[in-house]
Amino acid sequence: LEAKEAAKKAIDRFACGLSSSRPQATTIEHVQLEKRLAKWFGFETCLTFTTGYQAMLGTIAALADKDTTLILDSYSHACILDGTFLAAGTPGRAPEVRFFNHNSAKSLERILKSRERKNALVLIEGVYSLDGDRAHLKEFVEICERYEAVIVIDDAHGTGTLGERGTGILEETGLRDRVPVCVSTFSKTFGGIG
């Protein structure tokens, strides 16, 4: 009931829909939401996008460049694949792209050892949408730390379902402080997007 009333007030104040870019419309509300989400998830900061899909595309675009190897699980969600392929198609900024065998720490380590670029982003899902299994997160984090790679986790299917407070696989595994980037979505847990 509280959420419905808040939504009605927001519609009265800002209208409904994304009729312009964020700085021209609801920035105040977005900043407040981001502060609350960052605190809830246990991160220093948070950035909201219209959808979880767009959040992953934006994250990859912001972090990947010509000095980066993007390393993906072979069962990666479409948002990770599309973000990677968009980044790879950017002239002058295109990263190296490699895939590791699904949920295989050995395969990931082999690729990190042989990468050609200075920086590495390892893109995984907390709970894989393709088959429902969980990432071998502890092993992946240890390997990424060993090879100075940044791990980016899509926890769309873990948020709301895993951990004592429902903040996802990072809470459940106790690895929150060792994973710098986590992407999630409102559409699967919170019942609202846009």
Model-derived segments and spans:
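Conserved N-terminal alpha-helix of the aminotransferase class I/II PLP-enzyme fold
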Residues: 4-51
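Short, small-residue-enriched loops and turns at beta-alpha junctions
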Residues: 23-27, 78, 105-106, 127-131, ...
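Short glycine/serine/threonine-rich phosphate/pyrophosphate-binding segments
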Residues: 48, 53-59, 79-80, 159-162, ...
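Substrate-binding/gating loop at the entrance of the active-site cleft, primarily
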Residues: 51, 72-89
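Active-site phosphate-binding strand-loop segment of PLP-dependent enzymes
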Residues: 95-153
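Active-site PLP attachment segment
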Residues: 171-194
